[in-house]
Amino acid sequence: MRIVIEKILLKFFPKLYFGLTRAQDSNDRYLFGFNLIKKNIKDNPSILDVGCGSGNFYSYVNSISKTINYTGIDFDYEKMSKKKFYGKKNFNIISKDLRENWDVGEYDFVWSSEVIEHLFDDKKFFEQLVKSTKKNGYIIITTPYLNSYLSFAKKYGWSIEPSKEEIVGHVKLGYTEQNLVDFAKENSLSLQDIYFISECNNFRSKYFFKLNNGLFCYIFNFLYYMGLFRFKRFSSTKKQINKLNYFSIAAIYKK
């Protein structure tokens, strides 16, 4: 019975399904990407999801338009157990080592969420994103915000030691606004805007990792949807905000 309910929710109410079952910061990022793509979409758009996992972002963008062509790439996708979308005509996932050079064509939108901080050679990785983007196309990335991470780490005793292993850990603790500006300059891109994602108060930041897993995650998600917690999912730098209250930073570039 549970599996049947999950399939119904996934098919007809994907944003609700992921909002209740996934960590809210992940859902915040997906809704951020969904809104930016919806705002800039044209006819029959193509989307490349770099570091796609099991392709959950497909459910969000497919709800914008059924003419979207979605391709995801990630490490060893064939070994993943969650293959919810196999059989969809506009859905494709390819196994690629994201540390290497990969050529999967050019796309209108290249989306990569919380991936770049897992790789030592971030400049090479970003160059691959640019190579995969059509002229006048868009690159959208999200990554932990370094300044807020260090602030939270000081308050709550989080580790400030980067991982020594790529992929499984964060080899970089995060990025700053200047880092995202530099990516644009180094690759001759137009930086459209910088955003901050997942607003946190003292409670959410203190228990951030607990609220992302297991029973605590489900309870928090339910209360979130009931309106007990009210956080901004994302906000542009054009608005007056306290940046240190946001967990992730994001940018949209035009090629």
Segments predicted by a language model, with ranges:
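Conserved N-terminal segment of class I S-adenosyl-L-methionine
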Residues: 1-105, 109, 113, 123-126, ...
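Short conserved AdoMet
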Residues: 42, 120, 134
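Short aromatic-enriched loop/helix-cap "lid" or pocket-rim segments at secondary-structure transitions
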Residues: 83-85, 150-155, 203-209
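Residues lining the SAM
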Residues: 113-116, 142
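A short glycine-rich, Lys/Arg-flanked "PGG" loop and its adjoining helix->strand segment in the class I
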Residues: 124-138
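Conserved class I S-adenosyl-L-methionine
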Residues: 140-162
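Acceptor-substrate binding/catalytic loop of class I
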Residues: 162-179
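Conserved S-adenosyl-L-methionine
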Residues: 189-200
